[in-house]
Amino acid sequence: NFVENDYVFVDNGYSTNTGSWSVYQKNDATAYKRNFDKLFDQQIIDGGKFGSSIVASTQGVDVAVGTPGVNKVNIYRKRTTLSSLQIRNEITLDYGNTAADDNFGFSLAMTDDGGALFVSAPNTGDIIKLTLSATFRTFTRGQLITGGDTGATGRVLFSDPNNDYLIVKNTGSTDFINEGINADDSSSIVTVTKVEGADGLNQGQVSWITRDTSFNYGTQQTITAPSLDRGGLFGFDMAVDSTGEYLVISAPGGPDDSTFLNQGTVYVYKYSADSSSLDYTLHQTLTPSNQEVGSRFGESVDISSDGTTIVVGSTTATDSTTSTAGRVHVFRRTGSTFAEDEILIDTTTESDTRFGTSVQISSTGKDLLIGAPNETSNEANSGAV
């Protein structure tokens, strides 16, 4: 990510897969040098994978770093002290007591001013939606719930403000909470009914996190996959326009039906300050015009700063001559509706180049970078952009 005059670079940490990141600042018109110390997760946890995802505000004041191996995101703020620039850890966002492989922090997106941060957990799964049939005290995120004749155990992922429903992650292998549940203190019992969701392993979800004027961060909304597809990987990649009006979330692993298995879907959410709920609501669902099983539409996504152009990578799509070479779909907005305007393919005749694995569009939408990491340009799988 280029941030004003700063460049963020990721490489290895001290221990196995702990990860690190460094900031480079341009010292003249052409050269970059590392201007800050290399940063590591202060806990230095094996397998934390600190630096798997990085996002920054336009001026480089706010920087968020994902550590999905331990379901965590660190937020840093750049401050000027005694004429020197420093980046310090501002806050750590913990997902709670969830499965180690939920990968909270796998993908990040941030508005230009740094006031809104979006964090995905694409491997969250086994979600059950429960409707309460009796009054019960407020549940808290991460709270342990046990009970039911199956003996299943889960933790609360989300409860709406009125406690009308809960979304619970079941930690059992196959059983689900289906009758009574009780809280940790076992003093209150409530009957619940499962109304949707079953064994949706790797459905995924996205957290919208906001910052107040005192630089305190809190979860404003949890966005779950509109389609509870097993393996959908909702939140695999994300992008947001400069103001936060349009939020793009991909689910390259869905749907889980046999017709277009793993074709992939991209969801466009819209926020309006005039809305009574002040939440992001599903605005439009994007699918490729040339539908194909296993094309993984949504492996990568980006949106122009003005919110008029969306680009979507479909890495294992097949063109007319080359198998699984990959494609990139360009959607442009007219009024409030996005429509597919262009399909880009790799100019090589190779197969499996993974064209579209990464995409980056300029702020104006006039320039587009596309990664093809498996392309054989000089050596096998040496990659190209």
List PLM regions with ranges.
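Autoprocessing Asn-cyclization modules and mimics
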Residues: N1-S15, W21-V23, G125-I177, D185-G200
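Conserved beta-strand/short-helix segments
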Residues: N1-G125, D199-V385
